[in-house]
Amino acid sequence: MTTETLTVRDLGLRARAAARVLRSLPTARKAAALHAIARELQAREGVILAANARDVAAAEAARLPAHMVARLRLDAASLAAIADDVAAVAQLPDPVGETTPERILPSGIRVSQRRVPLGVLGVIYESRPNVTVDVAALALMSGNAVILRGGKETVNSNAALEGAIRAALASENIPEDAVQVIRDPARERMLELLRLDDLVDAIIPRGGAGLHRFCVENATVPVIVGGIGVVHIYLDESFTRDPADVARAVNLIRNAKVQKPSACNALDTLLIHVRALPVLPAIARDLTAHGVTLRADPPALAALQTAGLEAQAATDADYGTEFLALTASIRTVSGLEEALDFIAAHGNHTDVILTRDPTQAERFVQDVDSAAVMVNASPRFNDGGQLGLGAEVAISTQKLHARGPMGLRELTTTKWVVVGDGQVRE
């Protein structure tokens, strides 16, 4: 019986059985499985790319937006990069089995905490076949089984990728059911996964705000929400006094907005100190040269128009919007306090301050309640690879169970280990 003919509950039962095996696997065997997956992806390049070509053709026939088709498309180079990423995960430190120093309590019992896998993950995502492999690799290395539900646009690609992964696992005598893909793209199957709380330990959605909202509103399984949120940069006056700092600000803001505008850690709103407005034209000129549409409040709009630059008048809706495109809003503030109030109302993902005042920097770090807070660095660094985690399954913007990029450690939890010699509680 293939995963194509199994019910979602069947997948859950098989995943739970596989998870019992995975949680005890030594690091070397998990790493060997990932290297086997990397080899199998390369060996099946023709099959995988042919399946992907069918998905791309169907997407183009359905007139899906160009950016969705681009996310969907694989070629030999991108598949090789995916395989390399899997091999790289195998080199990461394995958090499973880490143990806190043992304490001996007055009762004589010895107490410690040990890091263990979450168990079974359900990951729901859209038109990115690379996520299928990336998430499978992270789940396996952290000792978790995973049930994957991709978008309908990736049905053929995901089936081919799942085949490669499962064949590699079988070659290493690891349960194939550690990685399973829901083949039926119907929303009813997603609902079944969201409500499989007796078998699935956590749901991790990867996609837009609509997908996250649907999961939160319909799941009985705990949902880890992430990847959505408004990104702010506050440009303090102190960072505009030195021409070299102005050049740094222009470069950093360009990187934050232009490098990958569809990313969740791309800039959405620039907050600028009113006394820093004289440098705004230099920033705006650079952004518009790279195709960015600007929406500004009255003081910023006046500064731009006086400099002969095009911009639109911002509306209230432009603040608090995650654009995921070459659009940014600009808001003038009287100082740090107003910037902090604004971010408190609109932020929770990644927020940046550009300042030469260490007191203001520390206040910003202390007061801003976001998954990542940065001083004089691009928000694009809020990424698992960039923060030294090696890879990530998602970027969580909630406070439980994890916050920020979710690497291997964030896919684990802890259990108490108590050792005694017949002690009883008095």
Curated annotation (Swiss-Prot):
Record GO biological process? L-proline biosynthetic process
A GO molecular function term, named singly, is: glutamate-5-semialdehyde dehydrogenase activity
Tagged with keyword Nucleus: no
Q: Matching InterPro entries, A to Z?
A: Ald_DH/histidinol_DH (IPR016161), Ald_DH_C (IPR016163), Ald_DH_N (IPR016162), Aldehyde_DH_dom (IPR015590), Glu-5-SA_DH (IPR012134), GPR_dom (IPR000965)
Primary localization = cytoplasm
Pfam families reported in the protein's UniProt record: Aldedh
Highest taxon of the lineage: Bacteria
| Protein location | Cytoplasm
Per its record, the protein catalyses: L-glutamate 5-semialdehyde + phosphate + NADP(+) = L-glutamyl 5-phosphate + NADPH + H(+)
Q: A cellular component term (GO) from this record?
A: cytoplasm
Alphabetically list the UniProt keywords.
Answer: Amino-acid biosynthesis, Cytoplasm, NADP, Oxidoreductase, Proline biosynthesis
Q: Note whether Amino-acid biosynthesis occurs among the keywords.
A: yes
Pathway(s) it belongs to:
Amino-acid biosynthesis; L-proline biosynthesis; L-glutamate 5-semialdehyde from L-glutamate: step 2/2
Q: What EC numbers are recorded for this enzyme?
A: 1.2.1.41
Tell me its family.
Answer: Belongs to the gamma-glutamyl phosphate reductase family.
Q: What is the role of this chain?
A: Catalyzes the NADPH-dependent reduction of L-glutamate 5-phosphate into L-glutamate 5-semialdehyde and phosphate. The product spontaneously undergoes cyclization to form 1-pyrroline-5-carboxylate.
Instruction: State the name under which the record lists this protein.
Output: Gamma-glutamyl phosphate reductase
**Source organism of this protein record:** Deinococcus geothermalis (strain DSM 11300 / CIP 105573 / AG-3a)
- The coding gene here is proA
